[in-house]
């Protein structure tokens, strides 16, 4: 059957889906349909019956607004995505949301839509493939051997994150990464030459990529030849495909009119006539389905891989078991027992150290049990303390390590980590100063939205970093992380809480964790076994009084020590004071009402929250009748001790505030 006719099935479904929803983006799917047909029918190794097959090729639609393209491909190829699902495009609770979302339609590898993040996720997936291959493949046993393909448009390339990711991809020689640039010259505002005149091929050549320029995106033979050349090259490849947006639409193709709006019934009729597509809305002939159906070939490809893995398992049984454990996302059998023993040992052996150092110690203790760790930092390893004795850096010619030097690329790092997590086989952690999570915020939000494991180490957590001043001193960042749905945020007060935070982040498979650590040393707190167990609940009674407290001090991180000192002084003056350490408000909020009431009795309304971050967040816990010792402005450049005094983080101020409240 004519390849163009098979590609027209994508065009027809895309036009019909957008028209039915009365919103969407038909232009990109219609423009990239020929490329998609060649890639999916002649090159992509996948099995519609098992979208989780470990050695499948990955396909990422970075220009996610063109979502009807991937939905059409999945439907036509035989995934569990029905024609009714396509008719429900952009409708409530459908499997076909406006932008592709991970966890809805089987075969969607990542959530895309915020431009540039899809190509960056793809870089992460390609890194994971190369690292897994280096760690597990043996001579004659290539059990990890797949490509990562991504489609991207002009918008992805305009976004700065594409520079961060593609630069690193070239440096690390990700030869299994193949990107298709949809060079159609059109964006929402019109012809892009007025705001995007880069020499994109030269840009990617400068990154160290293999660039295939000037490929006719509507010539199947040229597309096929480009893919073959890309697969044969040891470098990442950019295939520059010149396309016509809205291809087939006689009155709108090549213009921004078909970018982000339905074509309209009359134009769809005219387009189908021009394309020679003689079928009604959402009608696909059986002979077209037969040509597209990948179930039989996909099952055969996976069966062939299963035979390869069986041979590998016979030759390397321990490695095979470890590979299976890691791609399934399971922790080692001895994890719980050993990790809990490490935490108990820390409590029994006090140390007054910075929580960033406590974090490094936790990595040292836990890392030996977790070969799936894939660490990194945005050029701050000596400050974030993210390297441990078992860390080995990834290099272009040696990917057997477990540590990525991301360079100064916070946004790229975080979205790459999403790709690594989505690929499977690794537990990724990255790091920067808490202030610079602002560069990476949207990628962390995407991790929360997708419910993927992404552990971020954010150090230098307050005005406590001192002389670098307000450009580097976070104020509102902790609160913003706490306000992000499905984000788990921890700000520990000592080495014990730090280790607990790490343990829980490692165990959490349904979302990201932000671990927030100090630059300055923190005193270790005394705890009994019950208090030690209650750290995991996010908030617990660290110091109590006889009977009902008349005042509760709630603190996190470096301010817990301050609360303990103030409570001791107030207790000596006859006040009944309770101190609650609350390293994770989201973990505390998940506890049952009885536990929360036991820690923060509703009858005790005199409460003070103490945190060197934005004050307003804490009204949820202290009520309007309570007091908050926090930040209401940006910081200053000065030694940390002077800043804490200036902003009221002193025992004297806590005591005086308490007395005012109790008066």
Curated annotation (Swiss-Prot):
Top-level enzyme category: transferase
Cofactor binding note from Swiss-Prot or TrEMBL: Binds 1 Mg(2+) ion per subunit. Can also utilize other divalent metal cations, such as Ca(2+), Mn(2+) and Co(2+).
Oligomeric and partner information: Homodimer.
Marked site (Important for catalytic activity) residue numbers: 25, 259
Binding positions (thiamine diphosphate): 65, 113-115, 155, 184, 259, 436
Pfam families xref list: Transket_pyr, Transketolase_C_1, Transketolase_N
Keyword Calcium: yes
Protein name, UniProt field: Transketolase 2
Annotated GO MF terms: metal ion binding; transketolase activity
InterPro entries, per the entry: THDP-binding (IPR029061), Transketo_C/PFOR_II (IPR009014), Transketolase-like_C_2 (IPR055152), Transketolase-like_Pyr-bd (IPR005475), Transketolase_bac-like (IPR005478), Transketolase_BS (IPR020826), Transketolase_CS (IPR049557), Transketolase_fam (IPR033247)
Cofactor(s) demanded: Mg(2+); Ca(2+); Mn(2+); Co(2+)
GO BP term (any one): pentose-phosphate shunt
SUPFAM superfamilies: Thiamin diphosphate-binding fold (THDP-binding) (SSF52518), TK C-terminal domain-like (SSF52922)
Active site: 410 (proton donor)
Record field: catalytic activity: D-sedoheptulose 7-phosphate + D-glyceraldehyde 3-phosphate = aldehydo-D-ribose 5-phosphate + D-xylulose 5-phosphate
One cellular component term from this protein's GO annotations in UniProt: cytosol
Family of the protein in this entry: Belongs to the transketolase family.
Binding site for substrate: 25, 259, 356, 383, 460, 468, 519
Function (record text): Catalyzes the transfer of a two-carbon ketol group from a ketose donor to an aldose acceptor, via a covalent intermediate with the cofactor thiamine pyrophosphate.
Annotated binding of Mg(2+), by residue: 154, 184, 186
UniProt gene name: tkt2
EC code: 2.2.1.1
Keywords of this entry: Calcium, Magnesium, Metal-binding, Thiamine pyrophosphate, Transferase
């Amino acid at each position: 059957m004519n390849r163009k006719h098979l590609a027209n099935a994508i065009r027809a479904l895309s036009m019909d889906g957008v028209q039915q929803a009365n919103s969407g983006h038909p232009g990109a799917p219609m423009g990239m349909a020929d490329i998609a047909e060649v890639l999916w029918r002649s090159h992509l190794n996948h099995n519609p019956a098992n979208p989780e097959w470990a050695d499948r090729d990955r396909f990422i639609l970075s220009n996610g607004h063109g979502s009807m393209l991937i939905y059409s491909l999945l439907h036509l190829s035989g995934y569990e995505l029905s024609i009714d699902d396509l008719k429900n495009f952009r409708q409530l609770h459908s499997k076909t949301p406006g932008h592709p979302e991970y966890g809805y339609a089987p075969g969607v590898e990542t959530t895309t839509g915020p431009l540039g993040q899809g190509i960056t996720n793809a870089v992460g997936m390609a890194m994971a493939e190369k690292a897994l291959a280096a760690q597990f493949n043996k001579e004659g046993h290539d059990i990890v051997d797949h490509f990562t393909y991504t489609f991207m448009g002009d918008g992805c390339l305009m976004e700065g994150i594409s520079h961060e990711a593609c630069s690193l991809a070239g440096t690390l020689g990700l030869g299994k990464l193949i990107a298709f640039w949809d060079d159609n010259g059109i964006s929402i505002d019109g012809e892009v030459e007025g705001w995007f005149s880069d020499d994109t091929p030269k840009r990617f050549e400068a990154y160290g990529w293999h660039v295939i320029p000037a490929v006719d995106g509507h010539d199947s033979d040229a597309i096929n030849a480009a893919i073959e050349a890309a697969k044969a090259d040891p470098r990442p490849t950019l295939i520059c495909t010149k396309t016509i947006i809205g291809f087939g639409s006689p009155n709108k193709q090549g213009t921004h009119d078909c970018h982000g709006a339905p074509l309209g019934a009359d134009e769809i009729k005219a387009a189908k006539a021009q394309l020679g597509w003689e079928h009604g809305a959402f009608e696909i002939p059986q002979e077209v389905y037969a040509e597209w159906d990948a179930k039989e070939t996909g099952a055969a490809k996976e069966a062939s891989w299963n035979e390869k893995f069986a041979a590998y398992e016979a030759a390397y049984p321990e490695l095979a078991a470890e590979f299976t454990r890691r791609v399934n996302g399971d922790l080692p059998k001895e994890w719980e027992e050993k990790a809990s023993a490490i935490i108990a040992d820390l409590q029994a052996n006090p140390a007054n150290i910075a929580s960033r150092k406590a974090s490094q110690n936790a990595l040292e203790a836990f890392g030996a049990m977790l070969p799936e760790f894939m660490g990194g930092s945005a050029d701050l390893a000596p400050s974030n303390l993210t390297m441990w004795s078992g860390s080995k850096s990834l290099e272009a010619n040696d990917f057997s390590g477990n540590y990525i030097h991301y360079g100064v690329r916070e946004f790229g790092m975080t979205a790459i980590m999403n790709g690594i997590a989505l690929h499977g086989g690794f537990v990724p952690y990255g790091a920067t100063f808490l202030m610079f999570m602002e560069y990476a915020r949207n990628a962390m939000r995407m991790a929360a939205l997708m419910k993927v494991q992404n552990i971020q180490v954010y150090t230098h957590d307050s005005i406590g970093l001192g002389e670098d001043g307000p450009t580097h001193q976070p104020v509102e960042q902790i609160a913003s992380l706490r306000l992000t749905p499905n984000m788990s945020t921890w700000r520990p007060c000592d080495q014990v809480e730090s280790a607990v935070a790490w343990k829980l982040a490692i165990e959490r498979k349904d979302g990201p964790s932000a671990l927030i650590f100090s630059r300055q040393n923190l005193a270790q707190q005394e705890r009994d076994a019950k208090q030690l167990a209650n750290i995991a609940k996010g908030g617990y009674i660290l110091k109590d009084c006889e009977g009902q407290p008349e005042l509760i001090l709630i603190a996190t991180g470096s301010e817990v020590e301050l609360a303990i000192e103030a409570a001791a002084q107030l207790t000596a003056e006859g006040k009944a004071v309770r101190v609650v350490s609350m390293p994770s408000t989201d973990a505390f909020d998940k506890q049952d009402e009885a536990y929360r009431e036991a820690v923060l009795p509703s009858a005790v309304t005199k409460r003070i929250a103490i945190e060197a971050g934005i004050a307003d967040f804490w009204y949820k816990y202290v009520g309007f009748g309570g007091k908050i010792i926090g930040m209401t402005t940006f910081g200053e450049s000065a030694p940390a001790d002077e800043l804490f005094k200036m902003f009221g983080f002193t025992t004297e101020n806590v005591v005086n505030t308490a007395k005012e409240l109790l008066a």
